[in-house]
């Protein structure tokens, strides 16, 4: 053992250590490599260890635990599950090693190049402290390396461990366990551990996952049978046979699935026969597949690396740092003369020229003076070796200036700068960026790549032998018009021409830098690279080319060289070859046919035919083939497949097929005889029953009769206005229903069956009518009637604001957290109602939820819904189109639909709401959705959702249907969240957001454009009968409600008498301060049962009536005719009872319930009626919406606008401003009721009744209206949503605590 000596490594690693999060949310931390070195301060040593590994699950490196005292808390190590390097435990004094969740040690690095697990010298020599137990009870895999356990004085049970089961390569040299471990005081393993354990109890038994497996298993297992083998990609054991059941992965973990390799960056497209970019690609980061590398890593091919290799350079593409191969030499920036590390240098000389090796960019200047070229004896600098000047051949840019005042006499040009492209001129030498002075040996410049001199002037003078300079058009190199050229006292042009020092004939008139075709500024005809040529090698030459303008480009290497005057290629790439050199795959020439290339969903194998063209192998060939049929598949012995030749296996296959068919015939005949005998027996029994005149039902189901009524409408009562959309069987119109003999107009939606449909469509259409007529719930669209015209027509309520998907998309900037959570509750309650009636919706989505008002949504489109019989648990669908992206996996694969598959669709619907109309799996083809779901991928977490809301969605998307929550649980969960909306949804500006006015909806405006709203009446207003006028009570303080009144059946709300002089009257969904104004009260006649919710979430929701608008003007009372009371009855088997007189006052001064009224179970919300209710006698005013009007005729005042401010439960309206008035409003709390308010989630007292009001012109039950003071304003409470617990059910004398949460749009 050689202890490391670099103590500084600790400090540097402490600074560099960080934790990143891979895609599967596992915490990853960096390991250490200090071996036995430790800090001198043991306290600091412990703190460093804790800082490294607290909350760490995967250690990317080595886990080293050394020099820890006996009294230290090491419980933070329980989070470690995987170590990629080695585990070292040495020189410690603690008793127990708490690595209880460590499952795998990969051993990518080994201690002493040999051991993956090293445990030694863990005791104190002068004391009784030391390691006694290894808490490695879940360690089942060491992929590489051995185990060393030695010199642990107090260690027990280590010699009982079956290390050969843990170590993948258990060679004897890899296992070192000597007898110096342990003492005589060690106990025995528990009797259930069969002699192998990590500790004394039954929880410390060793789990064997390899040596107990069946011989057919090629890896780990979870039982002794053949069916208990783990997937071959599993490491450390598993809980099932799938690749998602592994405890750890042998190679890579891809979102919970163990795979051989991560999804590659490029996949083979069998349609285009090319490798294409894979949008689902992931990068390997350790043993994980991640969508994005950590910020301090770069992408090299398909892996995350700390730095690019020497042959690649780091570039950034689309925000991703990547390693790209260098075309020639990798970019390298170096300091120039007078900058950075060469700040004190005056010239390039032999002492600093090596600093320019492999430099491509010079940040600064290059200066060549006599003291650098010929040496400086004064400073002991030798003359420069001319060969070393070739280091400048890699330079492509000089940001400053180039100053050459001295040059080796044996060099006649500056060809070492042949790759110089740009002289930046950011720093100038007396205004010059290029200076060449008094170089007598220079004959040509040879700056053949120079394209730009960005700034500064040119000065070339006193070079007596320099030619070619006069042929160059220097202005083409300049970037500004202010640059100047000073060229003089060089060799005369005529002398140069006389000696033949002229440009090559292939150069253009732009000139040249020197002799030869490679020194031209541009070519007269064609160019190949930098060299000008006469013509391209189209038909001859060693390398064949094609012409791309004036540039000759070499053909692809896969093109075969053609003879006899034929072109080898017609353009770039392997798809433009005249003939392929090797093989042809589709239009492309390839070196070999695809053999195991990764495709979109599988690996691609192809074979070559005699014409050297590639063709796909048979689908059964999973490892390659030699021909097109399944007989040509290639099999390998190690795969477990038969290696017999095909002709030898054919007789066996034929015999097996014949034997199988014979057995099938025998089984079929036996089954037919059994069915026939059973049928005969059943007929005989039935005949005996009929002969005895049995009057009892033969098959009583126990199911209650369906007593819903179906209204038959005449075609003359319906008027179509405009088309709203089309469905599977017909078209939906906006229409008007004018009941026969009446003058009211009711806006409806009319669904008409297409005339071309057949009998089956008629049956399914009427089945839909049956389902809709049987459903009666506030959050389900109601069927009004059926018209049996030649084309069947279904008439339903018209939802004025369209579907919820378009509504949230249109108003996404105005929708807050309260409204979103209220919608979630309402949809869950509607689906809970369907589940109680054994109805599977099958097409739940935001597009199939309609908006009656901003606070009220309803589920529609029962076109796919199916009722389950009493003994059915699932529905098996036949053909037809299905909304794949909203469906559970079992629905896609097996077309099995249950209530739990509706829960999956509910999760997707909630995701649509939280993304304000986002498209699920946008951009992913539908056919790829099943594979995506099986791999564990789900919709991402919406930006506004907290982890609490997103986890509810994730639970809805569990593969196991029984693991998904019930709608009853979902309603309770979202009810709880809706009590504190801003805790669960984070929306910018939520506090300042106003609810969108229904009148602003584009869908709503389109509905109102084409129809006069005179005599318009809402459908529910028309159907629900009216009660007698009841003068409303006027009060300002809290009224008393007996909590005993909210039993299974509820009585109508009692009336209350005024309790102060200041009177408030509720009109049209708002309150107005008036004196002595009476408002009619409508008694309910139909009971809509509310499905129960989970314990602790049984409270109703009561919203502020002014949430969506301001106070209303007073409206004159109105009563409809008595005939309307006969229009609808909740129970068609019972006649409407006689109306009883008004209730009487009890002994405490409260109004007693009216007799013979149908009992109500809860209060209906007061909702906006978007249509106008106006009578011809003028007794009602036209209302656009009762919750969106001001109390005054003028424009709304600033103080009347709705603002999102918290409402406090213990603040009340003090209209009199007197102390005694406030005193009357304070309630006292009984002792037994105090505990119920410690946590508002557990308020479980009874609730007040709620009446069914479907028209906003009438008074909401006044027993539920209380007033609170909010910043000096008085606002009423209206039962808008039955999801919030109100304080009504408190007994008299109860004092409410301060509000624990802040709510928007709702008063708790």
Swiss-Prot record:
Phenotype for residue 1056 to A: Abolishes interaction with NEDD4 and impairs ubiquitination. Promotes nuclear translocation of ERBB4 intracellular domain E4ICD1
Localization of this protein: Cell membrane
Known catalytic reactions: L-tyrosyl-[protein] + ATP = O-phospho-L-tyrosyl-[protein] + ADP + H(+)
Primary enzyme class: transferase
Record-linked Gene3D superfamilies: 6.10.250.880, Hormone Receptor, Insulin-like Growth Factor Receptor 1, Chain A, domain 2, Phosphorylase Kinase, domain 1, Receptor L-domain, Transferase(Phosphotransferase) domain 1
Membrane topology: Single-pass type I membrane protein
Extracellular side: 26-651
Motif (PPxY motif 3): 1298-1301
Location of the motif PPxY motif 1: 1032-1035
Result of changing residue 710 to N: Strongly reduced autophosphorylation
Gene Ontology biological process terms, A to Z: cardiac muscle tissue regeneration; cell fate commitment; cell migration; cell surface receptor protein tyrosine kinase signaling pathway; cell surface receptor signaling pathway via JAK-STAT; cellular response to epidermal growth factor stimulus; central nervous system morphogenesis; embryonic pattern specification
Known outcome of mutating residue 675 to A: Abolishes proteolytic processing and nuclear localization
UniProt topological domain (Cytoplasmic) ranges: 676-1308
Keywords: Activator, Amyotrophic lateral sclerosis, Apoptosis, ATP-binding, Cell membrane, Developmental protein, Disease variant, Disulfide bond, Glycoprotein, Kinase, Lactation, Membrane, Mitochondrion, Neurodegeneration, Nucleotide-binding, Nucleus, Phosphoprotein, Receptor, Repeat, Signal, Transcription, Transcription regulation, Transferase, Transmembrane, Transmembrane helix, Tyrosine-protein kinase, Ubl conjugation
Binding site for ATP: 724-732, 751, 797-799, 843-848
Domain spans labelled Protein kinase: 718-985
Residues spanning the membrane: 652-675
Modified residues (Phosphotyrosine): 875, 1035, 1056, 1150, 1162, 1188, 1202, 1242, 1258, 1284
A GO MF term: epidermal growth factor receptor activity
Chain coiled-coil ranges: none
Family: Belongs to the protein kinase superfamily. Tyr protein kinase family. EGF receptor subfamily.
Role of this protein: Tyrosine-protein kinase that plays an essential role as cell surface receptor for neuregulins and EGF family members and regulates development of the heart, the central nervous system and the mammary gland, gene transcription, cell proliferation, differentiation, migration and apoptosis. Required for normal cardiac muscle differentiation during embryonic development, and for postnatal cardiomyocyte proliferation. Required for normal development of the embryonic central nervous system, especially for normal neural crest cell migration and normal axon guidance.
Subunit details: Monomer in the absence of bound ligand. Homodimer or heterodimer with another ERBB family member upon ligand binding, thus forming heterotetramers. Interacts with EGFR and ERBB2. Interacts with CBFA2T3. Interacts with DLG2 (via its PDZ domain), DLG3 (via its PDZ domain), DLG4 (via its PDZ domain) and SNTB2 (via its PDZ domain). Interacts with MUC1. Interacts (via its PPxy motifs) with WWOX. Interacts (via the PPxY motif 3 of isoform JM-A CYT-2) with YAP1 (via the WW domain 1 of isoform 1). Interacts (isoform JM-A CYT-1 and isoform JM-B CYT-1) with WWP1.
Descriptive protein name: Receptor tyrosine-protein kinase erbB-4
Taxonomic lineage: Eukaryota, Metazoa, Chordata, Craniata, Vertebrata
Name of the gene: ERBB4
């Amino acid at each position: 053992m050689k202890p490391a000596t670099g103590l500084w490594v600790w400090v540097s690693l402490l600074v560099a250590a960080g934790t990143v999060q891979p895609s599967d949310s596992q915490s990853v931390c960096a390991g250490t490599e200090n071996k036995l070195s430790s800090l001198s301060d043991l306290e600091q040593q412990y703190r460093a260890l804790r800082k490294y590994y607290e909350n760490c699950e995967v250690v990317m490196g080595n886990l080293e635990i050394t020099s820890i005292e006996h009294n230290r808390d090491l419980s933070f190590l329980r989070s470690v599950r995987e170590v990629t390097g080695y585990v070292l435990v040495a020189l410690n004094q603690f008793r127990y090693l708490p690595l209880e969740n460590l499952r795998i040690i990969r051993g990518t690095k080994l201690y002493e190049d040999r051991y993956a697990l090293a445990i030694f010298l863990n005791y104190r020599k002068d004391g009784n402290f030391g390691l006694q137990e290894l808490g490695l009870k879940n360690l089942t895999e060491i992929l590489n390396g051995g185990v060393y356990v030695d010199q642990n004085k107090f260690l027990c049970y280590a010699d009982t461990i079956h290390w050969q089961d843990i170590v993948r390569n258990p060679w004897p040299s890899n296992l070192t366990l000597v007898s110096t471990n342990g003492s005589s005081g060690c106990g025995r393993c528990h009797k259930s551990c069969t002699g192998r354990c990590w500790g004394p109890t039954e929880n410390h038994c060793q789990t064997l996952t390899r040596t107990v497996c069946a011989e057919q298993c090629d890896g780990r297992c979870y039982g002794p049978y053949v069916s208990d083998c783990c997937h071959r990609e599993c490491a450390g054991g598993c809980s099932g046979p799938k690749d998602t059941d592994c405890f750890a992965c042998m190679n890579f973990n891809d979102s919970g699935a163990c795979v051989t390799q991560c999804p590659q960056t490029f996949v083979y497209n069998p349609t285009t026969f090319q490798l294409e970019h894979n949008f689902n690609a992931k990068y390997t980061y350790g043993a994980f597949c991640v969508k994005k590398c950590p910020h301090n890593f770069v992408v090299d091919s398909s892996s995350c690396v700390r730095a690019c290799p020497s042959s690649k350079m780091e570039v950034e593409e689309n925000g991703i740092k990547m390693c790209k191969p260098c075309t020639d030499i990798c970019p390298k920036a170096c300091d120039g003369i007078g900058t950075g590390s060469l700040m004190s240098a005056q010239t390039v000389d032999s002492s600093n020229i090596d600093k320019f090796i492999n430099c491509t960019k010079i940040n600064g200047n290059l200066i060549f003076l006599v003291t650098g070229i010929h040496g400086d004896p004064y400073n002991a600098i030798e003359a420069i070796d001319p060969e070393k000047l070739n280091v400048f051949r890699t330079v492509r840019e000089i940001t400053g200036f180039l100053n050459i005042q001295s040059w080796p006499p044996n060099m006649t040009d500056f060809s070492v700068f042949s790759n110089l492209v740009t002289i930046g001129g950011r720093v100038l030498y007396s205004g010059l960026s290029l200076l060449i002075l008094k170089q007598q040996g220079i004959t040509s410049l040879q700056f053949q790549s120079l394209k730009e001199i960005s700034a500064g002037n040119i000065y070339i003078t006193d070079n007596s032998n320099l030619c070619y300079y006069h042929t160059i058009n220097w202005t083409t190199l300049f970037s500004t018009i202010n640059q100047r050229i000073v060229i003089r006292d060089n060799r005369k042009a005529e002398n140069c021409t006389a000696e033949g020092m002229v440009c090559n004939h292939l150069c253009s008139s732009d000139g040249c830098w020197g002799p030869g075709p490679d020194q031209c500024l541009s070519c007269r005809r064609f160019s190949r690279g930098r060299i000008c040529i006469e013509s391209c090698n189209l038909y001859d030459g060693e390398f064949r080319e094609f012409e791309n303008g004036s540039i000759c480009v070499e053909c692809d290497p896969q093109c075969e060289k053609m003879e006899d005057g034929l072109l080898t290629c017609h353009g770039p790439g392997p798809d433009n070859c005249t003939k392929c050199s090797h093989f042809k795959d589709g239009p492309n020439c390839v070196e070999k046919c695809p053999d195991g290339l990764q495709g979109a969903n599988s690996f691609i194998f192809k074979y070559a035919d005699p014409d050297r063209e590639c063709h796909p192998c048979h689908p059964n060939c999973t490892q390659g083939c030699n021909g097109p049929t399944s007989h040509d598949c290639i099999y390998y012995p190690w795969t477990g497949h038969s290696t017999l030749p095909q002709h030898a296996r054919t007789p066996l296959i034929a015999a097996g097929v014949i034997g199988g068919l014979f057995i099938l015939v025998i089984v079929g005949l036996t089954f037919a005889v059994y069915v026939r005998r059973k049928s005969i027996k059943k007929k005989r029994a039935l005949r005996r029953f009929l002969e005895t005149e049995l009057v009892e039902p033969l098959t009583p189901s126990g199911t209650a009769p369906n007593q819903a009524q179906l209204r038959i409408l005449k075609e003359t009562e319906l008027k179509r206005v405009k088309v709203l959309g089309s469905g599977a069987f017909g078209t939906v119109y906006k229409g008007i229903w004018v009941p026969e003999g009446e003058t009211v107009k009711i806006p409806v939606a009319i669904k008409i069956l297409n005339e071309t449909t057949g009998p089956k469509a008629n049956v399914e259409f009427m089945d839909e009518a049956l389902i809709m007529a049987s459903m009666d719930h506030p959050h389900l669209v109601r069927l009004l009637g059926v018209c049996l015209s030649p084309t069947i027509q279904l008439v339903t309520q018209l939802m004025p604001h369209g579907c919820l998907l378009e509504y949230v998309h249109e108003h996404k900037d105005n929708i807050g957290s309260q409204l979103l959570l209220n919608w979630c509750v309402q949809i869950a309650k509607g689906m809970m109602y369907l589940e109680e009636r054994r109805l599977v919706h099958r097409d739940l989505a935001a597009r199939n939820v309609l908006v009656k008002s901003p606070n009220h949504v309803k589920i529609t489109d029962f076109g796919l819904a199916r009722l389950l019989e009493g003994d059915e648990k699932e529905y098996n669908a036949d053909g037809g189109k299905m909304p794949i992206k909203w469906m559970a996996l079992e629905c896609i694969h097996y077309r099995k639909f249950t209530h739990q598959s509706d829960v999956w669709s509910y999760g997707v619907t909630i995701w649509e709401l939280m993304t304000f109309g986002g498209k699920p799996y946008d951009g992913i083809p539908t056919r790829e959705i099943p594979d995506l779901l099986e791999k564990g991928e789900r919709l991402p977490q919406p930006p506004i959702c907290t982890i609490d809301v997103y986890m509810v969605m994730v639970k809805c998307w569990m593969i196991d249907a029984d693991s998904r929550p019930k709608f009853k649980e979902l309603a309770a969960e979202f009810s709880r969240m809706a009590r504190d909306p801003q805790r669960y949804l984070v929306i910018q500006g939520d506090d300042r957001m106003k609810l969108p006015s229904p009148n602003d909806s584009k869908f709503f405006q389109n509905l109102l454009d084409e129809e006069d709203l005179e005599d318009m009446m809402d459908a529910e207003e028309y159907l629900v009968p009216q009660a007698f006028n009841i003068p409303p009570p006027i009060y300002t303080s809290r009224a008393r409600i007996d909590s005993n009144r909210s039993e299974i059946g509820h009585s109508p709300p009692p009336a209350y008498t005024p309790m102060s002089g200041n009177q408030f009257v509720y009109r049209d969904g708002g309150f107005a301060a008036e004196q002595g104004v009476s408002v009619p009260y409508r008694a309910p006649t139909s009971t809509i049962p509310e499905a129960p919710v989970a314990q602790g979430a049984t409270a109703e929701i009561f919203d502020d009536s002014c949430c969506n608008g301001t106070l209303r003007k007073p409206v004159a009372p109105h009563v409809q005719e008595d005939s309307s009371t006969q229009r609808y009855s909740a129970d068609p088997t019972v006649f409407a009872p006689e109306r009883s007189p008004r209730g009487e006052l009890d002994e405490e001064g409260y109004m007693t319930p009216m007799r013979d009224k149908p009992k109500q179970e809860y209060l209906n919300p007061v909702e906006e009626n978007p249509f106008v209710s106006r009578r011809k006698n003028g007794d009602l005013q036209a209302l656009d919406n009762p919750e969106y009007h001001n109390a005054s005729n003028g424009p709304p005042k600033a103080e009347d606008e709705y603002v999102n401010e918290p409402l406090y439960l213990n603040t009340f309206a003090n209209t009199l401003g007197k102390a005694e008035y406030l005193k009357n409003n304070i309630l006292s709390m009984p002792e037994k009721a105090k505990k119920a308010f410690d946590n508002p989630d557990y308020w479980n007292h009874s609730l007040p009744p709620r009446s069914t009001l479907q028209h906003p012109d009438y008074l909401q039950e006044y027993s539920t209206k209380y007033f609170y003071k909010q910043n000096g304003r008085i606002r009423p409470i209206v039962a808008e949503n039955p999801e919030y617990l109100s304080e009504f059910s408190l007994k008299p004398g109860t004092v409410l605590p301060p509000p624990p949460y802040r709510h928007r749009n709702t008063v708790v």
